[in-house]
Amino acid sequence: MIFYILFFFGIIKSQENYSYQKPPPEILELVDITLPPRVLIDENKNFMIYLYRNSYKSIDELSSPEIKLAGLRLNPNSNSRSRTNYYNNILISKMDQIDKSAKQIKGLPKNPKLANIKWSPDQTKIAMTNTKEEGVELWYIDLEKLTAKKLTGPKLNASLGDVITWYQDSKNILTKFKLKNSPDIIDGVDVVPTGPIISSNDGKKAQNRTYQDLLKNEVDEKNFETLARSVLSKVSLKGKTKLLAKKNLYHEIDFSPDGKFILISIIQKPFSYLVPYYRFPMKYAIYSSKGKELTVLHEVPLIEDLPKGFMAVRTGPRNFSWRSDRPSNLIFVEALDGGNPETDIKYRDEIFEVGYPFKQNKVSLLKTINRFYRIDWCNDTLALGYDYWWNSRNTKTYIFSPSNTNKEPKIIIDRNYQDRYNDPGSFVKRRNFYGKSILAMNKQNLYLMGDGFRDDGQFPFIDQLNLESLKKVRLYESSFKDKKEDLLDFEADNNMILTRIESASEYPNYFFRDLKTDSLTKITDFENPFLSIMDVSKEVIEYKRSDGIDLSATLYLPKGYDINKKQKLPMIMWAYPREFKDNKSASQITQNKNEFTFPYWGSPIYWLTRGYVVLDDVSFPIIGEGDNQPNDNFRKQLVDNASSAINRVYELGYIDKEKVAIGGHSYGAFMVANLLSHSKLFAAGIARSGAYNRTLTPFGFQSEERNYWEAPDTYYNMSPFMHAEKVKTPLLLIHGEEDNNSGTYPLQSERYFNALKGLGATTRLVMLPKESHSYRAKESIMHMLWEQDRWLERYVKNK
């Protein structure tokens, strides 16, 4: 009887049932706010669009019908993505008028759920979708008239790829529609099996990541076809609809710059149970603007067996796209190394151009030493090509002449893309006659906008690059030391910069900066909604690891903290490990103390209101120079990063060293579990949505491209699950029940919790219903904050 009572109460204690809870008022005040809108500005700076949405979804919204197919999550009732973020209001400001105040759009739907916002080519209109329970509607807004109009009923198919695409005339929209007589969705639970599910392999190596939400059986295949199949129709702004192309599994849709042709990708069979839909067989074809198929460019087979490595690609033509500075010239890439990164060859990729009829007389434009990345077009005599190689972190920029293939391309930038201090920036673009993005060139000059990270701070800049001498002249460099400036656009013709400026306590606002007069014109006036943390202390601290690597972090002290008395407070650290191939890049400071203090849903900043010191964005580099792999020395570097950070804040006199917590999300959660397994630095840990057993991700994870059988010791040593018996520190595990991130499926937290519990650790597992890898519902987020606060109060502050 005594055994029964103890057993019964053991079950009660181990399995608690709670309704959704709310965090303390100090935290709740920062969560329950309305954020300023997202801002869009047209190329000519005539219109500013304010897009409003709720800060969070509700658990009711998140509980809408959902079916998981081929890597997608779809709402079968509305035939759309089930986890889309929607806007609920739109305001417009006409920036070329005296009255620049934001005006309400007339005629918007009731209780709008707006998405797929698309500028028209002439940038006087925007198209969008409105999602209702029974389907998705097509709407558009006339920006001059400030009016919205519904063009179709709830007939669109918004499940896959491009849903709406403007015609070049800005008067018609190419739209995906549901089939009129589409089959009903099959409920697989009630289907009687006709046989086993069989997967086989003919001896080829097929090493794939642990993708989720894949097809599992024939019922899934049929449901995928039902929800993904659509017809293409032309919809005029008067609401007239004309069928353009018959039913198919249309994916991506892209008009040629002159609007005469359409590049379309179409998913084919056979489907796969191993990889998501975007690696299914795919047909690339050219259609006329009237919907006639003209040319099949290439039929890509099922991609299940790529060579090993992050730089592996398939063979055959890939990366089909239109050349943005020409009417209808098609670009594609082919691997010269068979797609295999281990092949030793001078050039990895070759880029080709082909014109109508798109099947003959292809012209080679460029060969890249690394894997092709993209091309920025300008004109017949100038384009910039980019490549990159993950293993060395190298990227190159090539200048070449598209019309003169005899002219040797020249490498003008050759750098480590993780080296932020020497980042030359990105080339400025502009819209051309076709409404496409091309390089902004003025009198043989191009322009670069850079973030401007240096060892003494962040100072964004604009450089002018002369194409003949390849010499640079600095046109502008931010001089702010008490604010953060982000350069968004530059018009060389009138020396005008569109910029965004913020400070730790000032919400980001948009400005025009006139370089001629060195003046600023404010164009938005958003206020800080987080008043309770407006006056907290914030600084970027610098310190060294035991091996001499320079580290940094953002340190926050609670409002009213007396810097002279230096009361020793509890601290919460939050971090995310990152891999580097050189010490120099790993040591660079990329935090900015003037960045606006924004407590997003997963932030530790909330605990400033609860009397904690917060150390956020803590440097956690994992370095492997030369032939050394970063992860082969993962644990030692991890502990060294953590102890160095704690010691620095302790030396400053702010914290009780015995009352420090560590937290992280995803790979940061993996970090937390490892630190609690291999150090005694912390009073408690919070690990959200992590992976803890690397044998369950045997073909690579994060930045590890070796498989388990190539590096078994590394996989074992890095897996907290294998060292669960060492955890003596209280650990709070939180996970979304519907996590679809590769490698972090909920089983990871469930099995790790069971191991910790079985070994006598102090631990708690919170599974959030309906949540994926990032949490969306307000109820879930509030409960998460409540759980974290209780954990910190019990095991850290009141230790």
Model regions and ranges:
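Active-site glycine-rich loops that stabilize anionic/oxyanionic intermediates
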Residues: 576-581, 592
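Beta-propeller folds
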Residues: 4, 14-518, 525-535, 550, ...
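Conserved hydrophobic/aromatic pocket- or pore-lining residues that grip, position, or stack substrates
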Residues: 284, 330, 412, 510, ...
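Bacterial Sec-dependent N-terminal signal peptides
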Residues: 1-16, 737
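Active-site-proximal cap/loop segments of hydrolase catalytic domains
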Residues: 86-91, 588-799
